[in-house]
């Protein structure tokens, strides 16, 4: 019989183990913090020991004892070994957030094929590799949540981000295909598509000019966004908890855009 009642406990992550890739700072850190506050055990990885150590210390400063691992998300053998180690030391992963990513802002005809491949490797191939590593144990356990950090750039184009947009467009479709292939195993795979978020990656676009004026791109984004501001990593916390919790058990293959309305807005008519 279907349970027709609602309980706020549906949003609880108590007893869950969450792996968030590249979560020493920024969006990944904010999502991890929200998961910990919802009751989950936090596991994260980063590319080197220094970043992992800094991440562990940052988590401790906010009262979270996180488990940190050094691993390159593009190294398939390394990821397989890391997941096995996590299962032995912490437990089977219930929630995976494919957060690690990079961007290269270069006009397409000036971008090397090597740089293009690097973005694709980290932003698209890595979520495939990490998801592939965790899904078998999720199937055995009878449930699992995978959240891919996509982007509004999977829906529109802009100069200098061809590799990033291509990777995030591919990640959107990987999300839908994981949902299609493993939904019957009670695995939900969804994506969060952030708009322009104030992180270290976007800091150069928000720097004040020498005369004290706003960066032209900063002005452009604020004018183009109905919310009239950049997003913050904390704006992704609620959506991330929803997609990791039982409250989203019938949501699968969906990209939840958290963009302040930018995708819905054609822009203001010039006066």
Cite the ranges covered by each PLM segment.
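Short C-terminal tail/terminal secondary-structure segment
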Residues: 2-9, 156, 241, 252-271
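Conserved glycine-rich cofactor-binding loop
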Residues: 17, 24-26
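Substrate-binding pocket helix/loop in short-chain dehydrogenase/reductase
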Residues: 107-108, 115-120, 217, 221
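C-terminal substrate-recognition "lid" of short-chain dehydrogenase/reductases
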Residues: 128, 143, 229-258, 263
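Active-site helix of classical SDR
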Residues: 131, 167, 175
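Alpha-helical segment proximal to the catalytic Tyr-Lys
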Residues: 136, 180-184, 249
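Residue(s) in the substrate-gating loop at a strand-loop-helix junction
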Residues: 151
């Amino acid at each position: 019989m279907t349970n027709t009642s609602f309980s706020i406990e549906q949003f609880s992550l108590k007893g869950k183990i969450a792996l968030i890739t590249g979560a020493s700072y920024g969006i990944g850190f904010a999502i991890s913090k929200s998961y910990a506050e919802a009751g989950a055990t936090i596991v994260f990885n980063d590319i080197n020991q220094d970043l992992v150590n800094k991440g562990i210390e940052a988590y401790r400063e906010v009262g979270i004892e996180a488990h940190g691992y050094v691993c390159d998300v593009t190294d398939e053998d390394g990821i397989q070994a890391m997941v096995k180690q996590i299962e032995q030391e912490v437990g089977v992963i219930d929630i995976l957030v494919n957060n690690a990513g990079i961007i290269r802002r270069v006009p397409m005809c000036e971008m090397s094929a090597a740089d293009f491949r690097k973005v694709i490797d980290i932003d698209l191939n890595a979520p495939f590799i990490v998801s592939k590593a965790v899904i078998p144990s999720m199937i055995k356990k009878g449930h699992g949540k995978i959240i891919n950090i996509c982007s509004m750039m999977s829906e529109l184009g802009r100069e200098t981000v061809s590799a990033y947009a291509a990777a995030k467009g591919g990640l959107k479709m990987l999300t839908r295909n994981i949902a299609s292939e493993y939904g019957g195993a009670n695995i939900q795979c969804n994506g969060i598509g952030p708009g322009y978020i104030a992180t270290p990656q976007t800091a150069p676009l928000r720097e004040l000019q020498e005369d004290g004026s706003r960066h032209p791109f900063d002005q452009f984004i604020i004018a183009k966004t109905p919310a009239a501001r950049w997003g913050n990593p904390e704006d992704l916390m609620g959506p991330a908890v929803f997609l990791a919790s039982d409250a989203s058990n019938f949501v699968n293959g969906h990209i939840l855009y958290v963009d302040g309305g930018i995708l819905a807005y054609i822009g203001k008519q010039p006066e």
